[in-house]
Amino acid sequence: MAGPLLMWVLALTAVSGCFWPQDDQVFSQIPPKRNSPPRIILDQVKPGGVDVSLKPGCPNPFSIIVEDPDIADPISNRWFVYAPGAKPLAYFDGDKIPSSTKAVRDKPITPPAQWLNISSELNQNGEHRFEVVIADGNFKASSGTEVEPHQKTLLDGGLVDDPSYIDSYVWVVKTSDSLPACSE
C-alpha cells in the first residue's frame, strides 16, 4: 500500500518541478509608479451643461474642479476660444494649480483675466466654442494641447518618458447683446 502512494508522491514532485520556472528573479525594489491621468469632475463644472448664453461684458461664469491621483503633480490649464467650424481664435494659459495633499484640488480653475478684456472673442455676438484643457504636465509652448512627458528613473538607473495626460471640457457659448442684464 505504501509503495503506490510513494510512487504517486514522487511522480507529482517530479512533474511539479516542470511547472515552476527555475530562473525566477526577485526584484529588490518595486518599479516606479506610472503617471495617472487627471480628470475634470463633471458635476463640479460651472456653468453645468454644454450650452451657455452670455451677454458681452458679463462676469466670468466658468470654473472647473480637477482630480489627479498623483498629488505631487501641478495642474496646467489652457483655455481656447473657437469660432464655428474654425481653428482656435485665441488661447490663454491659466495659473498653474500647485501640487496638493489631496487628489481633488480645492482651488477651482477659472479662465485667466486676459479673456475678459473688451476685445475678447467671447465679447463678440455669435456662437463660440469655449474649451478648457487640463494637463498633469507642462504644455509645450505654442503647441495647443501637446504636453511634455514626465521623466521617471528606472531600477537600473535609466530614464524613461512617462506620458502626461490631458482632459478637456467644452461649452457652446451663445453671446448676444439682446440677453437680459448680467446676473451675479
Predicted regions and their residues:
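Short beta-strand elements
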Residues: 140-184
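Surface-exposed, flexible coil segments in extracellular/virion-facing regions
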Residues: 74-122
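Extracellular acidic, Ser/Thr/Pro-rich low-complexity tracts
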Residues: 63-71, 83
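Post-signal peptide N-terminal segment of mature Sec-exported envelope proteins
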Residues: 27-51
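Signal that preferentially marks extracellular ectodomain short beta-strand elements
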Residues: 63-65, 101-127, 135-145
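Bacterial signal peptide processing site
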Residues: 18-23
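A short beta-strand segment in extracellular, disulfide-stabilized domains
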Residues: 53-66
